[in-house]
Amino acid sequence: MRFALTEEQEAIVATTRQFTEKELIPHEERVEKLGEVPPDLVKQIKERSIAAGIYACNMPAEYGGGGLNSFDTTLVDREFGATSYALHYIVARPSNILRACKGDQITEYLIPTITGERVDCLAMSEPDAGSDVRGMKCTAVKDGSDWVINGTKHFISHAD
């Protein structure tokens, strides 16, 4: 059995490779020296990845995402692997957990995240559990219109 990418998949690879070489790799040295990605660079990369059709490529097309399947999204990830994770994480796409949005959650969370107006965060790591989700102790409890978080988190991705 011979395996080959379709023309569309080859175009996905070429677009992502070109984006990575032009928009990400040139900033690697600066980001590594700073130890962070400056906010202006985050904004620039996000805007350009949206324009290139790469941002939210894993989200449903019916809500403005790219509609790529898991395999095609992996092709995008493979090309991003040529650069610093700190840089390609900016365009690493919204979390797949957003696919579970229903009803009002779609307009409140999913669509604004797909368009780049909102950022999804991941707060998984804890002092006594690391990133073992079964060992997590932190809880979030609804209190009126607010949420009360009880516990401690580390390494909250996109929390800035």
Task: Locate predicted features.
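Intrinsic disorder at enzyme termini
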Residues: 1-12, 140
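A non-catalytic, amphipathic alpha-helix used as a structural packing/dimerization or gating element
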Residues: 8-22
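Glycine-rich flavin
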Residues: 25-160
